[in-house]
From Swiss-Prot:
InterPro entries: RibonucZ/Hydroxyglut_hydro, RNase_Z/BN, tRNase_Z_dom. This is Ribonuclease Z. Homodimer. Its EC number is 3.1.26.11. The gene is rnz. One of its GO terms (molecular function) is zinc ion binding. It holds the Pfam family Lactamase_B_4.
Length: 306
Protein backbone atom coordinates (compact mmCIF):
# COMPACT_ATOMS: atom_id res chain seq x y z
CA UNK A 1 0.00 0.00 0.00
CA UNK A 2 1.08 3.58 -0.48
CA UNK A 3 0.07 7.00 0.84
CA UNK A 4 0.65 10.06 -1.35
CA UNK A 5 0.23 13.67 -0.24
CA UNK A 6 -1.15 16.21 -2.71
CA UNK A 7 -1.46 19.00 -0.17
CA UNK A 8 0.21 19.60 3.19
CA UNK A 9 -0.57 23.22 4.08
CA UNK A 10 -3.04 24.40 6.72
CA UNK A 11 -5.75 26.92 5.94
CA UNK A 12 -4.23 28.52 2.85
CA UNK A 13 -2.04 27.24 0.03
CA UNK A 14 1.50 28.53 -0.27
CA UNK A 15 3.84 28.73 -3.24
CA UNK A 16 5.29 25.40 -2.12
CA UNK A 17 2.36 23.57 -0.54
CA UNK A 18 -1.25 23.01 -1.54
CA UNK A 19 -4.17 22.56 0.84
CA UNK A 20 -5.07 19.15 2.20
CA UNK A 21 -5.42 16.03 0.06
CA UNK A 22 -4.22 12.47 0.61
CA UNK A 23 -4.41 9.42 -1.67
CA UNK A 24 -4.31 5.86 -0.34
CA UNK A 25 -3.37 3.29 -2.98
CA UNK A 26 -4.90 -0.04 -1.95
CA UNK A 27 -2.58 -2.31 -3.92
CA UNK A 28 -1.97 -5.24 -3.54
CA UNK A 29 -5.44 -5.72 -2.05
CA UNK A 30 -7.25 -3.76 -4.76
CA UNK A 31 -6.58 -1.63 -7.83
CA UNK A 32 -8.66 1.20 -6.38
CA UNK A 33 -7.59 4.44 -4.74
CA UNK A 34 -9.19 6.21 -1.80
CA UNK A 35 -8.89 9.96 -1.31
CA UNK A 36 -8.97 11.65 2.08
CA UNK A 37 -9.93 15.34 1.86
CA UNK A 38 -9.87 17.32 -1.36
CA UNK A 39 -8.55 20.82 -0.84
CA UNK A 40 -8.64 23.48 -3.53
CA UNK A 41 -6.39 22.57 -6.46
CA UNK A 42 -6.23 18.85 -5.73
CA UNK A 43 -7.13 17.81 -9.27
CA UNK A 44 -4.31 20.00 -10.60
CA UNK A 45 -1.86 18.32 -8.20
CA UNK A 46 -3.01 14.90 -9.37
CA UNK A 47 -2.14 15.85 -12.96
CA UNK A 48 1.51 15.75 -11.89
CA UNK A 49 1.17 12.15 -10.67
CA UNK A 50 0.41 8.77 -12.21
CA UNK A 51 -2.82 8.41 -10.20
CA UNK A 52 -5.96 8.39 -12.36
CA UNK A 53 -9.28 9.73 -11.10
CA UNK A 54 -11.06 6.78 -12.70
CA UNK A 55 -9.46 4.52 -10.08
CA UNK A 56 -10.80 6.61 -7.20
CA UNK A 57 -13.89 4.79 -5.90
CA UNK A 58 -14.09 6.27 -2.38
CA UNK A 59 -13.57 9.77 -1.03
CA UNK A 60 -13.48 10.38 2.73
CA UNK A 61 -13.89 13.92 4.07
CA UNK A 62 -12.69 14.64 7.59
CA UNK A 63 -14.56 17.91 8.12
CA UNK A 64 -16.24 20.75 6.26
CA UNK A 65 -13.60 23.48 6.47
CA UNK A 66 -12.72 24.91 3.08
CA UNK A 67 -9.09 23.84 2.97
CA UNK A 68 -10.34 20.24 3.06
CA UNK A 69 -13.30 20.40 0.62
CA UNK A 70 -13.02 23.32 -1.82
CA UNK A 71 -11.42 21.13 -4.48
CA UNK A 72 -14.14 18.49 -4.34
CA UNK A 73 -16.74 19.80 -6.85
CA UNK A 74 -14.16 20.32 -9.58
CA UNK A 75 -12.55 16.95 -9.00
CA UNK A 76 -15.92 15.19 -9.16
CA UNK A 77 -16.81 16.79 -12.49
CA UNK A 78 -13.36 16.07 -13.94
CA UNK A 79 -13.68 12.42 -12.91
CA UNK A 80 -16.44 12.10 -15.52
CA UNK A 81 -13.87 12.70 -18.25
CA UNK A 82 -10.87 10.91 -16.74
CA UNK A 83 -11.91 7.28 -16.68
CA UNK A 84 -14.75 7.58 -14.19
CA UNK A 85 -17.68 7.34 -16.58
CA UNK A 86 -20.22 4.87 -15.23
CA UNK A 87 -18.02 3.93 -12.25
CA UNK A 88 -19.84 4.37 -8.92
CA UNK A 89 -18.26 6.58 -6.26
CA UNK A 90 -18.85 6.48 -2.52
CA UNK A 91 -18.48 9.82 -0.71
CA UNK A 92 -18.21 9.64 3.07
CA UNK A 93 -18.06 12.65 5.36
CA UNK A 94 -19.78 14.80 7.97
CA UNK A 95 -23.42 15.78 7.75
CA UNK A 96 -23.74 18.47 5.10
CA UNK A 97 -21.37 16.99 2.52
CA UNK A 98 -24.25 15.79 0.34
CA UNK A 99 -25.98 19.19 0.37
CA UNK A 100 -22.68 20.91 -0.41
CA UNK A 101 -22.01 18.79 -3.49
CA UNK A 102 -25.57 18.67 -4.79
CA UNK A 103 -26.01 22.43 -4.36
CA UNK A 104 -22.72 23.19 -6.11
CA UNK A 105 -23.52 20.88 -9.02
CA UNK A 106 -27.04 22.28 -9.35
CA UNK A 107 -26.05 25.94 -9.30
CA UNK A 108 -23.20 25.38 -11.76
CA UNK A 109 -25.45 23.18 -13.93
CA UNK A 110 -22.84 20.44 -13.81
CA UNK A 111 -23.75 16.86 -14.67
CA UNK A 112 -21.96 13.70 -13.60
CA UNK A 113 -22.02 10.53 -15.69
CA UNK A 114 -21.63 8.20 -12.72
CA UNK A 115 -23.62 7.60 -9.50
CA UNK A 116 -22.54 8.84 -6.07
CA UNK A 117 -23.51 7.10 -2.85
CA UNK A 118 -23.40 9.52 0.09
CA UNK A 119 -22.72 8.35 3.64
CA UNK A 120 -22.98 11.13 6.21
CA UNK A 121 -21.49 10.54 9.65
CA UNK A 122 -23.26 11.74 12.77
CA UNK A 123 -20.91 10.60 15.55
CA UNK A 124 -19.39 7.28 14.52
CA UNK A 125 -19.11 5.13 11.41
CA UNK A 126 -18.33 1.44 10.92
CA UNK A 127 -17.93 0.63 7.23
CA UNK A 128 -16.73 -2.41 5.31
CA UNK A 129 -15.58 -2.61 1.69
CA UNK A 130 -13.85 -5.53 -0.03
CA UNK A 131 -12.36 -6.81 3.19
CA UNK A 132 -11.32 -3.38 4.47
CA UNK A 133 -12.78 -2.21 7.75
CA UNK A 134 -13.10 1.55 8.30
CA UNK A 135 -14.00 3.15 11.61
CA UNK A 136 -14.62 6.89 11.96
CA UNK A 137 -14.65 8.63 15.33
CA UNK A 138 -15.44 12.21 16.30
CA UNK A 139 -12.52 14.49 17.12
CA UNK A 140 -12.36 17.91 18.85
CA UNK A 141 -12.12 20.76 16.36
CA UNK A 142 -15.03 23.07 17.14
CA UNK A 143 -17.03 21.65 14.22
CA UNK A 144 -17.67 17.95 13.48
CA UNK A 145 -14.29 16.52 12.47
CA UNK A 146 -13.44 12.86 12.13
CA UNK A 147 -10.47 10.55 12.18
CA UNK A 148 -10.50 7.36 10.13
CA UNK A 149 -9.02 4.03 11.16
CA UNK A 150 -8.49 1.75 8.15
CA UNK A 151 -7.76 -1.92 8.73
CA UNK A 152 -6.61 -3.80 5.63
CA UNK A 153 -7.80 -7.38 5.07
CA UNK A 154 -6.06 -10.44 6.38
CA UNK A 155 -4.09 -12.26 3.70
CA UNK A 156 -3.79 -15.99 3.30
CA UNK A 157 -0.97 -17.65 5.19
CA UNK A 158 2.10 -18.91 3.38
CA UNK A 159 1.64 -22.24 1.62
CA UNK A 160 3.45 -25.14 3.28
CA UNK A 161 5.16 -26.62 0.23
CA UNK A 162 6.67 -29.51 2.19
CA UNK A 163 3.28 -30.63 3.48
CA UNK A 164 1.79 -30.52 -0.01
CA UNK A 165 4.67 -32.52 -1.43
CA UNK A 166 4.04 -35.17 1.23
CA UNK A 167 0.64 -35.86 -0.34
CA UNK A 168 2.22 -35.83 -3.78
CA UNK A 169 1.17 -32.35 -4.88
CA UNK A 170 4.09 -30.60 -6.55
CA UNK A 171 4.23 -26.81 -7.11
CA UNK A 172 1.93 -25.71 -9.91
CA UNK A 173 -1.43 -24.11 -10.74
CA UNK A 174 -3.19 -26.30 -8.16
CA UNK A 175 -1.49 -24.31 -5.43
CA UNK A 176 -3.84 -21.42 -6.24
CA UNK A 177 -6.75 -23.62 -5.13
CA UNK A 178 -4.97 -24.23 -1.85
CA UNK A 179 -4.29 -20.53 -1.42
CA UNK A 180 -7.72 -19.18 -2.35
CA UNK A 181 -10.23 -21.84 -1.26
CA UNK A 182 -11.22 -23.43 2.05
CA UNK A 183 -10.86 -26.90 0.55
CA UNK A 184 -9.19 -28.45 -2.48
CA UNK A 185 -9.36 -31.79 -4.27
CA UNK A 186 -6.36 -33.91 -5.21
CA UNK A 187 -6.40 -37.50 -6.44
CA UNK A 188 -10.04 -37.82 -5.46
CA UNK A 189 -9.50 -36.69 -1.88
CA UNK A 190 -10.87 -33.44 -0.37
CA UNK A 191 -8.38 -31.62 1.86
CA UNK A 192 -8.78 -28.62 4.18
CA UNK A 193 -6.58 -25.84 2.83
CA UNK A 194 -5.81 -24.53 6.31
CA UNK A 195 -3.86 -27.72 7.03
CA UNK A 196 -1.39 -26.72 4.33
CA UNK A 197 -0.97 -23.03 5.11
CA UNK A 198 0.46 -20.90 7.84
CA UNK A 199 -1.66 -18.53 9.91
CA UNK A 200 -3.43 -15.71 8.09
CA UNK A 201 -1.44 -12.48 8.09
CA UNK A 202 -3.05 -9.35 9.48
CA UNK A 203 -3.08 -6.41 7.09
CA UNK A 204 -1.68 -2.99 8.02
CA UNK A 205 -3.61 -0.47 10.09
CA UNK A 206 -3.68 3.13 8.89
CA UNK A 207 -4.96 6.08 10.96
CA UNK A 208 -5.81 9.31 9.13
CA UNK A 209 -6.88 12.28 11.22
CA UNK A 210 -8.82 15.40 10.47
CA UNK A 211 -8.06 18.62 12.32
CA UNK A 212 -8.21 18.25 16.08
CA UNK A 213 -6.84 19.17 19.44
CA UNK A 214 -6.02 16.28 21.80
CA UNK A 215 -9.05 14.16 22.66
CA UNK A 216 -9.86 10.69 23.96
CA UNK A 217 -10.94 9.23 20.62
CA UNK A 218 -7.50 9.83 19.14
CA UNK A 219 -6.05 6.83 20.93
CA UNK A 220 -8.92 4.62 19.73
CA UNK A 221 -8.22 5.60 16.13
CA UNK A 222 -4.43 5.33 16.35
CA UNK A 223 -4.13 2.26 18.57
CA UNK A 224 -1.13 0.21 17.33
CA UNK A 225 -1.39 1.76 13.86
CA UNK A 226 1.37 0.86 11.44
CA UNK A 227 1.11 4.30 9.85
CA UNK A 228 -0.54 7.42 11.25
CA UNK A 229 -1.26 10.63 9.35
CA UNK A 230 -1.84 13.52 11.75
CA UNK A 231 -2.05 17.27 11.60
CA UNK A 232 0.41 19.53 13.38
CA UNK A 233 -0.60 23.06 12.53
CA UNK A 234 1.88 24.27 15.12
CA UNK A 235 5.31 22.65 15.06
CA UNK A 236 7.08 24.95 17.52
CA UNK A 237 6.35 27.45 20.29
CA UNK A 238 3.66 27.44 22.96
CA UNK A 239 1.29 24.52 22.41
CA UNK A 240 -1.54 26.28 24.27
CA UNK A 241 -1.95 28.46 21.18
CA UNK A 242 -2.66 25.37 19.08
CA UNK A 243 -5.27 24.11 21.50
CA UNK A 244 -6.93 27.54 21.67
CA UNK A 245 -7.75 27.09 17.98
CA UNK A 246 -8.69 23.40 18.31
CA UNK A 247 -5.53 22.26 16.54
CA UNK A 248 -2.57 20.08 17.48
CA UNK A 249 0.98 21.01 18.42
CA UNK A 250 3.82 18.66 17.52
CA UNK A 251 4.21 17.81 21.22
CA UNK A 252 0.57 16.65 21.23
CA UNK A 253 1.29 14.38 18.27
CA UNK A 254 4.38 12.90 19.92
CA UNK A 255 2.35 12.14 23.04
CA UNK A 256 -0.27 10.36 20.94
CA UNK A 257 2.41 8.34 19.12
CA UNK A 258 3.74 7.06 22.44
CA UNK A 259 0.39 6.42 24.12
CA UNK A 260 -1.14 4.66 21.10
CA UNK A 261 2.01 2.68 20.22
CA UNK A 262 2.14 3.94 16.62
CA UNK A 263 4.90 2.51 14.43
CA UNK A 264 5.47 5.54 12.21
CA UNK A 265 3.84 8.94 11.78
CA UNK A 266 3.51 11.22 8.79
CA UNK A 267 2.86 14.80 9.89
CA UNK A 268 0.90 17.15 7.63
CA UNK A 269 -1.21 20.34 7.82
CA UNK A 270 1.65 22.53 9.00
CA UNK A 271 0.73 26.21 9.19
CA UNK A 272 1.05 28.12 5.92
CA UNK A 273 3.45 30.51 7.64
CA UNK A 274 6.20 27.86 7.58
CA UNK A 275 8.43 27.57 4.53
CA UNK A 276 9.77 24.16 3.51
CA UNK A 277 13.22 25.21 4.71
CA UNK A 278 11.85 26.20 8.12
CA UNK A 279 10.01 22.89 8.44
CA UNK A 280 13.20 20.98 7.62
CA UNK A 281 15.20 22.97 10.18
CA UNK A 282 12.64 22.27 12.90
CA UNK A 283 12.53 18.60 11.88
CA UNK A 284 16.30 18.23 12.27
CA UNK A 285 16.16 19.87 15.68
CA UNK A 286 13.38 17.56 16.88
CA UNK A 287 15.04 14.42 15.54
CA UNK A 288 18.24 15.26 17.39
CA UNK A 289 16.41 14.72 20.69
CA UNK A 290 16.64 11.17 22.08
CA UNK A 291 12.97 11.11 23.12
CA UNK A 292 11.55 11.96 19.69
CA UNK A 293 9.48 9.09 18.18
CA UNK A 294 9.76 8.07 14.50
CA UNK A 295 8.06 10.70 12.31
CA UNK A 296 8.32 12.73 9.13
CA UNK A 297 7.03 16.18 8.18
CA UNK A 298 5.69 15.49 4.70
CA UNK A 299 5.84 17.72 1.62
CA UNK A 300 3.51 17.81 -1.37
CA UNK A 301 3.99 14.73 -3.58
CA UNK A 302 5.74 12.75 -0.85
CA UNK A 303 4.77 9.07 -0.84
CA UNK A 304 5.13 6.43 1.84
CA UNK A 305 4.93 2.71 1.03
CA UNK A 306 4.23 0.04 3.62
Amino acid sequence: MEITFFGTSAGLPTKERNTQAIALNLEPYSNNIWLFDVGEGTQHQILHHSIKLGKVDHIFITHMHGDHIFGLPGLLTSRSFQGGEGKPLTLIGPKGIKAYIETTLRLSESKLNYPITYIEIENHLSYQNNGFNVEAHMLNHGIPSFGYRIEAPYTSGKIDVSALKEIGLEPGPKYQDVKNNETFEYNGIIYNSKDFKGDAVKGPVIAIFGDTMPCQNEEIIADHANVMVHESTYIEGDKSLANNYHHSHIEDVFTLIENAHVDYSLITHMSNRYTIEEVETISKSLKSLPTTPPFKFVKDFDSWSF
